[in-house]
Amino acid sequence: MKKFSLILACLFLTGCATTNMPSYLQPKKPYIKRYYSNYDKTLSSVKSILTELGWGLEEATDPGVYEHTRFNDLDENKLLLVTAVRPTPMLVGTRYARMNIYLRSKKEVSEVEVRYLTTTSTALNNFSTYNNDGAVKRFFARLDEVLPPVEMLSK
């Protein structure tokens, strides 16, 4: 009985860690790829692939709202897609994931940049990582089937 009371008291005193998932993800580990495709075709392909992979769109906005200093040679048409937070229950806590997809296009070349944030929430702490190679590779592999890639860029 004493052990149970001690465990219960510890759980009561520790509480829960609060998880806050930002809409805008910093460019800590971006994945970038260029395609021979115009803006409209790239946008429709990206949206359909996100839906196919189980991601919901929360917001579509101009990236200039969040980033003012970045310049790219493909800045004629640009858009930031923010996915909805995707929770995954785990044994110890819950993992929350979100993606930002940046589209930059000029004429017949489009650049797709994916930023991924995973936050694992446990009773005591939150752990965040800015990459998920497997999920992003699945996204780009599916996009490669639809659009012809130019080259892989790394930063």
Regions found by a protein language model. Give the residues of each.
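Sec-dependent bacterial lipoprotein signal peptides
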Residues: 1-18
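Ser/Thr-rich, low-complexity intrinsically disordered terminal regions
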Residues: 17-155
